[in-house]
Amino acid sequence: MKSHIQSLLEQTLESFKQQGIVPADFEARIQVDRTKDKSHGDLATNLAMMLTKVAGKNPRELAQLIIDTLPASAYVAKVEIAGPGFINFFINDSALADQLQNAVNDEHLGIKLPTPQTVVVDYSSPNLAKEMHVGHLRSTIIGDSVVRALEFLGHKVIRQNHVGDWGTQFGMLLAYMEELRAKNGEKAQLELSDLENFYRAAKLRFDESAEFATRARQLVVELQSGDEYCNKLWREFNDISLSHCHEVYARLGVSLTRADVHGESAYNADLEQVVKDLDAQGLLTESNGAKVVFQEAFRNKEGEPLPVIIQKADGGYLYATSDLAAMRYRSNVLKADRVLYFVDLRQALHFQQVFSLAKLAKFVREDMSLEHLGFGTMNGEDGRPFKTRSGGVVKLVDLLEEANVRALELVRSKNPDMDEVTLTEIARVVGISAVKYADLSKNRTSDYIFSFEQMLSFEGNTAPYLLYAYTRVAGIFKRVTDLDLSQAKIVLEHEKEKDLGNKLAQFGEILSRVVDKGQPHVLCAYLYELAGAFSSFYEACPVLAADNDAQKNSRLLLAQLTARTLQKGLNLLGIETLERM
């Protein structure tokens, strides 16, 4: 409905250009918003106020001219001017009912699909050689949710798990294995079964011994140069580490697979060419032995230029080098229209610099959109970054296990007579869903406080509340026998039916915001509001005890659409639904 009103306004603006009311080359981004007060209609635009200056008319006069020029539409019952020149649209109830009727048998719930694009999504991307921790949660689940929404809307999505499988940490592991083998021979291999402790011991040696640190850096260069021994060990480290990652992905219900892994090492053969191409364009400068690029737009507080380091003095490469190679690959080989990076907000400057450099060096097509969709931090209840009681990093698998234990206690307390197998399965879904939803429901760019107590509550905007809301709606159909809605028609008579219908009709525009802005929290808020709208409808409008069969079947269709929308919305967030709680 929103897109329909935008289309009417675009046609009106085009007519204004032809009539000379506004310049022929005038461009405007027409904004249509949902009204907060239903007495002001369903949708509103400030187009008249946007055109005041170029048209040389007062906004109310322009608003009336817009109304007079609008093409006729069966969807619009009436149009009014409000305040200084807002234009309010009242949607025809029968047109809304028709829109909902079309959604009943449509796998996309009546959503008009956009022109498909090829979208590369870079998310999760943990550094290998150690276990995933809570700091990896946000990129992994926010990225996965946006990927699901993109695919649902018909886009071609290429997942890229740009794991950190190259660099100093592998030099440390190689050097440590070298030391252990010198002492223990091939038996040293057994210690790799606990990669986390192996990494911790290597890091301790790196920090304590300058000689060890030098050797580790040398081994990184040898690894990057293709040394056979280093590469064999490196593959073993990677395989063990990736196995840990994919156990976590499976537990989280994340759609990443081994086929999606395209880490830093994938671009190793391209790094030398990146340096040569930048040099050939006269972009490289030598600074303290390193090869760097300075861009005029990037300076520090003192006004000094900030470098993008491309190659270190010892010949090693950095994140910027592999990022540039990846951007070129994603533009020229994968033919991406958009590339989305779900990486911590603290990396904003890095991405601004490399995006700018990639365009400057013509490594990427001009029409390809590079987007850093950064996120804030997950903090403990003290407001500081989430840590263990001893101050250590919380392993993601430990967090999920605690969520499962707490969810099991909660579900058991509410269902003391339920069998253990069912309890365990419900607790698994509730625990994982609670962790994911608590994160996804927060604005991506905000920091948030992690609280098991809040996320496992059945009140408010939480996973348990929405999972229960879905079972409540779906439960209606368990009480109906011989249901046949094939000839049923949606009719919106009661105010609460209209409110629910309006909310259901917004699903498409909500998903557009999720994929355009990378904001799953908008979908979470919508699902919470939809559950509330259904609750109000259910209290005011008897479904199974309706006045007649036509009314009952109409309300059953509204309930069915609500259940499908809740289920699809939760699934797009990567959350399973339950048939009982």
Curated annotation (Swiss-Prot):
Residue span of motif 'HIGH' region: 126-136
Q: Does the keyword Membrane apply?
A: no
Which processes are annotated in GO (biological process)? arginyl-tRNA aminoacylation
Q: Where in the cell is it found?
A: Cytoplasm
Q: Which EC class, in a word? A: ligase
Provide the family line: Belongs to the class-I aminoacyl-tRNA synthetase family.
Q: Tell me, how does this one assemble?
A: Monomer.
What protein name does the entry list? Arginine--tRNA ligase
Q: Which organism is it from?
A: Shewanella baltica (strain OS185)
